[in-house]
């Protein structure tokens, strides 16, 4: 009897301690506008976070937020537009633009993405700063060393195709991932290397046109495709890496001919100034007369310019509505959302920040 009384008292104590914990609320709990939707999270170029040690926790906050909101937002994948690091292979610190070596930046980027390993697939279109010594002029990269396919178990079931990188190595620099959702059918997300070679575009085109994937809705992610504000397509950029294709050629050789590529995501461009100087958007019809949404989102100079905090934590929630053709775009910052003091600034509400993309059959 004494033991039973002791057990009951202990149970009551634990219950009383647990109640306040269960009653607590997240700083800024997220939810979908429709509970039957699913989402993908778009993160712009994170290089500004990793190049200064003081900025680095902001990148981890973003990836941790994605992992934490997996169920609430029914997140299927995290998409990145490239430039995980500021410099691929450099040991000389330029205090005017960074205080981390390339190895330190790669290690931190890997650490932050590790928040998603085993939780969510993440799909990265590598940028110019992942290649060469400092800016993407040469073809070598450390990307496959830090992101081998074995590191994230969530890739196992959705990775369906890959193409060798510029060094002839097997890598997810050029990779395709398949998702199946009741309301949207089958989706194919393809990521391509920095300034993709013709053979990469040929691989992606043949994949899209193949019998297996011809009826999929395709999302294509590449680093350089649109300029900020004007949304003009990039062309003939001043990099020594060859062969190379930029926005105009990618449109002509891949996106326009493929009837099922309906969304293109990119980063890369931008200039200090207003938020509008870090984003752009346009729609054009492809060869089949179907609209193709094209969106540039690059956070690196938000939060204080080139030497600021790396992006203020801004990311985009892409909510795929249950009608099977509407994608709601919302621009959100976990950095502002995590504190009640700044929560009112966590969502941007301008015309370029929240809008609908309609993907008609």
Residue spans of the language-model regions?
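Active-site neighborhood of phospho(di)ester-bond hydrolases with catalytic His/Asp-centered motifs
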Residues: 42-44, 76-83, 121-127, 192, ...
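Active-site-proximal segments of metal-dependent phosphoesterases and phosphodiesterases across multiple
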Residues: 95-102, 198-202, 211-262
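Conserved beta-sheet core of the metallophosphoesterase superfamily
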Residues: 242-322
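Loop/turn elements at helix/coil->beta-strand transitions in domains of secreted/extracellular proteins
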Residues: 36-39, 72-78, 117-123, 182-188, ...
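A short C-terminal boundary segment appended to hydrolase-like catalytic domains
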Residues: 307-361
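Active-site-proximal beta-strand elements of phosphoester/diester hydrolases
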Residues: 37-50, 185-195, 221, 293-298, ...
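N-terminal active-site segment of His-dependent metallophosphoesterases
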Residues: 24-101
């Amino acid at each position: 009897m004494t033991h039973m009384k002791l057990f009951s008292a202990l149970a009551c104590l634990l219950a009383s301690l647990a109640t306040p914990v269960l009653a607590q609320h997240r700083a800024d709990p997220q939810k979908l506008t429709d509970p039957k939707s699913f989402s993908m999270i778009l993160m712009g170029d994170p290089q500004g976070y990793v190049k200064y040690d003081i900025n680095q926790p902001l990148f981890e906050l973003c990836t941790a937020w994605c992992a934490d909101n997996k169920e609430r937002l029914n997140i299927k994948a995290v998409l990145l537009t490239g430039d995980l690091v500021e410099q691929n292979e450099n040991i000389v610190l330029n205090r005017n633009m960074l205080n981390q070596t390339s190895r330190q930046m790669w290690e931190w980027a890997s650490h932050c993405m590790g928040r998603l390993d085993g939780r969510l697939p993440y799909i990265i279109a590598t940028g110019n700063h992942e290649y060469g010594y400092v800016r993407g002029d040469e073809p070598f990269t450390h990307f496959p060393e830090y992101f081998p396919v074995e590191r994230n178990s969530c890739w196992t079931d959705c990775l369906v195709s890959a193409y060798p990188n510029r060094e002839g190595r097997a890598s997810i620099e050029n990779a395709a991932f398949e998702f199946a959702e009741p309301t949207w059918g089958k989706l194919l997300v393809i990521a391509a290397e920095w300034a993709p070679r013709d053979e990469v575009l040929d691989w992606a085109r043949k994949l899209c046109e193949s019998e297996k994937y011809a009826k999929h809705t395709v999302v294509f992610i590449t680093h350089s495709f649109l300029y900020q504000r004007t949304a003009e397509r990039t062309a003939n950029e001043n990099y020594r890496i060859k062969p190379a294709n930029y926005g105009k050629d990618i449109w002509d050789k891949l996106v326009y001919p493929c009837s099922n590529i309906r969304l293109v995501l990119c980063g890369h461009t931008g200039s200090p100034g207003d938020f509008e100087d870090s984003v752009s958007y346009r729609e054009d019809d492809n060869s089949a007369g179907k609209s193709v949404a094209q969106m540039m989102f690059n956070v690196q100079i938000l939060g204080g310019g080139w030497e600021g905090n790396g992006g203020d934590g801004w990311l985009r929630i892409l909510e795929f509505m249950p009608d099977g053709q509407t994608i709601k775009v919302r621009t959100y910052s976990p950095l502002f959302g995590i504190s009640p003091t700044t929560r009112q600034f966590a969502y941007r509400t301008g015309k370029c920040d929240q809008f609908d993309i309609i993907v008609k059959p």
